[in-house]
């Protein structure tokens, strides 16, 4: 195992193939959500149901992403990250093909839940292996750059999905997702190292419960995990609800819908690139503080503009773009601080983080949907602002200890 770790840290071609293939799998699972969302308007027409099912597809997907987090992280600690990750890539491909057999919206939503379980493998297994494979400053840069590749999904997904449903049946998207996952499997099979530290230990449910209890008793971890969830919630609520807001609510075309995503996710990528440049030069706490201003300020602009004029969707887009830059700058460092706030094995810690975040996303997207149904764009963006303010309060509590994140890259 030491040979694996040392060779990985040297960042050779084989070592770089591992994060590239992991991000290909991540891209497949993300585009499995972002590309299908504009296509959901065609899906609900196929099954003869109303548009309230559009965001529910994403809710089911993220609920699946929470379902097995508690097990996969500790399981990969004990039997190895590599076999668990490889099974995950094959599982996602299989569920993407199985959804082609559905004949009702209920069956479709159930399959979306089962597909969402594939998200569990990214944080609880894949990213834990990344964190264990590279030294800290290099790891933050790799994580930020990997995020840029993964973020092509929400940048291109809406455009590609809107174009796809005009040219091809929506079912063909899932064949594409399966093909990408199988390609990632081949690369991971060749290049993924084994980094698990507790291999061979027996998996005991009582011991597992004790591990999670110890993790959740850590206040810094709890604040960081909740903050990670509330930081990304406005973005995910936007992805889920924006087809209805833009196409049905504002009466714009699917092309306009896709183009309105470009500044938001373009700024998210710019924030990640800025983070990659500053990482190692600035303390992590400073990077988080720098990201706080555009995050909260952007959400405030979106809320104020749409409360003043319900159809100010360009101001809403501008505010969300500013917010997206902030989250790109702050989130990778926050994830790192939270993951290493506990001395427990990283598979368990990462799984606990994932469950907390996915619970916030699953519940929050549904709350955001009803906020829009009851109060339109203003209420939806006010909900997002509240999420941002909760993030700010949690960050303030987490960074109360002046030593947390003080060293550059730590």
Swiss-Prot record:
A single cellular component GO annotation: plasma membrane
Alphabetized SUPFAM superfamilies for the sequence: MFS general substrate transporter
The keyword Transmembrane helix appears for this protein: yes
Membrane protein topology class: Multi-pass membrane protein
One GO BP annotation of this record: xenobiotic detoxification by transmembrane export across the plasma membrane
GO molecular function: sodium:proton antiporter activity
Xref: Pfam families: MFS_1
Protein localization: Cell inner membrane
Periplasmic side: 37-52, 104-109, 166, 248-255, 308-313, 368-375
Keyword Electron transport (UniProt): no
Cytoplasmic side: 1-15, 74-82, 131-144, 188-226, 277-286, 335-346, 397-410
Subunit structure as annotated in this protein's UniProt entry: Monomer.
Record function comment: Efflux pump driven by the proton motive force. Confers resistance to a broad spectrum of chemically unrelated drugs.
PANTHER family xrefs: MAJOR FACILITATOR SUPERFAMILY, MULTIDRUG TRANSPORTER MDFA
Family: Belongs to the major facilitator superfamily. MdfA family.
Name of the molecule in the record: Multidrug transporter MdfA
This protein's encoding gene: mdfA
């Amino acid at each position: 195992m030491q040979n694996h770790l040392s060779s990985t840290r040297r960042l050779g071609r084989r070592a770089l193939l591992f994060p590239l293939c992991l991000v290909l799998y991540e891209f497949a699972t993300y585009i499995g959500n972002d590309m299908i969302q504009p296509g959901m308007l065609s899906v609900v027409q196929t099954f003869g149901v109303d548009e309230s099912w559009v965001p529910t597809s994403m809710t089911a997907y993220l609920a699946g992403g929470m379902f097995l987090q508690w097990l996969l992280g500790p399981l990969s600690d004990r039997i190895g990250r590599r076999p668990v990750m490889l099974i995950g890539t094959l599982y996602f491909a299989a569920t993407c093909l199985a959804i082609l057999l559905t004949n009702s919206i209920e069956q479709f939503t159930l399959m979306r839940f089962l597909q969402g379980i594939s998200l569990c493998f990214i944080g609880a297994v894949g990213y834990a292996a990344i964190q264990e494979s590279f030294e800290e400053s290099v790891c933050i840069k790799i994580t930020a750059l990997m995020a840029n590749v993964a973020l092509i999904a929400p940048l291109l997904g809406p455009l590609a999905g809107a174009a796809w449903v005009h040219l091809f049946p929506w079912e063909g998207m899932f064949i594409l997702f399966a093909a990408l996952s199988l390609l990632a499997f081949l690369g991971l099979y060749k290049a993924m190292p084994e980094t698990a530290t507790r291999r061979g230990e027996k998996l005991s449910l009582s011991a597992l419960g004790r591990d999670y209890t110890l993790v959740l008793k850590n206040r810094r971890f709890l604040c960081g995990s909740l903050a990670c969830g509330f930081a990304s919630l406005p973005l995910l609520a936007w992805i889920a609800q924006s087809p209805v807001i833009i196409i049905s609510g504002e009466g714009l075309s699917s092309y306009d819908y896709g183009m309105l995503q470009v500044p938001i996710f373009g700024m998210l990528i710019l924030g990640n690139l800025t983070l990659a440049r500053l990482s190692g030069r600035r303390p992590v706490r400073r990077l988080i503080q720098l990201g706080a201003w555009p995050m909260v300020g952007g959400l405030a602009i979106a809320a104020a503009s749409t409360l003043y004029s319900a159809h100010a969707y360009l101001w809403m887009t501008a505010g969300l773009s500013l917010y997206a830059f902030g989250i790109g700058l702050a989130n990778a460092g926050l994830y790192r601080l939270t993951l290493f706030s506990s001395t427990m094995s990283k598979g368990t810690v990462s799984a606990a983080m994932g469950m907390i975040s996915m619970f916030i996303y699953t519940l929050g997207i549904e709350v955001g949907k009803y906020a829009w149904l009851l109060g339109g764009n203003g209420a939806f963006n006010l909900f997002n602002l509240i999420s941002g303010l909760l993030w700010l309060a949690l960050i303030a509590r987490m960074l109360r200890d002046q030593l947390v994140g003080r060293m550059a890259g730590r």
